[in-house]
């Protein structure tokens, strides 16, 4: 049966709307601390382990996802993520940190990783002439999810309790992911004109020679290139700083600018809008100005943003700066698959993208825990935010060198 590529995009967004609820974790931070008697850093470990397993499972299962196809891998994601959410309800009921880390962190994280990479390479093949737009479309739902999940979690927690919040959402997420995954598949002959292969051949002809001498790299070949390591580092930096802010933005807003818990939950929802919008807007912009220059812009803006965030206590300015950082954070995710396809080709994109996502796993540990531990040690966030600004300076330099290298090679 012939399928519609816009419905394919809707199915991709459906999967990411579910698994992207991890970005609303900061709404649950204080309720989990109070319910289980944990410290801020102990609670943050659940989120960090989930992101670690997201990155590791995406890195090691990228080739597996390519082999079995998006429908089957989507169902695997549903099983792991749904089980993780329902098991988290049990962990909270029993007040067991070990079970919290096991279900939300390990099992939920594997569901996140498989679900995250499942639709990306599929949509690139359905939108071959607009690969940046396609990856932004696929990943957009992951960012937008907090808009729905943040207020929903706050409402469910206040009405039916923290345990039933995880139980109800786990069942809903399982059903939506399975339904969405059942529609996904690559385009068949004649369904997309021009095909991805034809688009790439045309682009190669216009360039007259590939900057990297090969049109398509395998995962192993890509990882032997210095460009892979440069991309990994700028991806790691953007995520470390952005995800550290995301994981703790609700308690941070309550402490720094004195938001109420309800206001902080609403702000998390707004962050979800900006996170999602940044993914689709920046990836589309990157189709016009190039992926390399887009990353240079990200880091230039974030150097300013993190420095100013460390010294401001004014509510409106705080909100604007956080939203700017989150916009760049989301855009960094959506531009990366297209940047990889520009440099390494698309034949093994899912596998290569998976290896880059290991940076997300490590950053998921580094960002939130550095921010949480230094907050407990110093009583504030200023030193960590200054550190993040410094990391952005290094990433800016690396992104510039990579961009200039790619331009000279054409």
Label every model-predicted segment:
Residues 57-70, 279-290, 375:
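Helix-to-loop junctions at the C-terminal end of transmembrane segments
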Residues 25-30, 220-282, 337, 367:
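Extracytoplasmic gate region of multi-pass secondary transporters
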Residues 97-113, 317-331:
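Hydrophobic core of transmembrane alpha-helices in multi-pass small-molecule transporters
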Residues 142-189:
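Helix-loop-helix hairpin linking two adjacent transmembrane segments in secondary transporters
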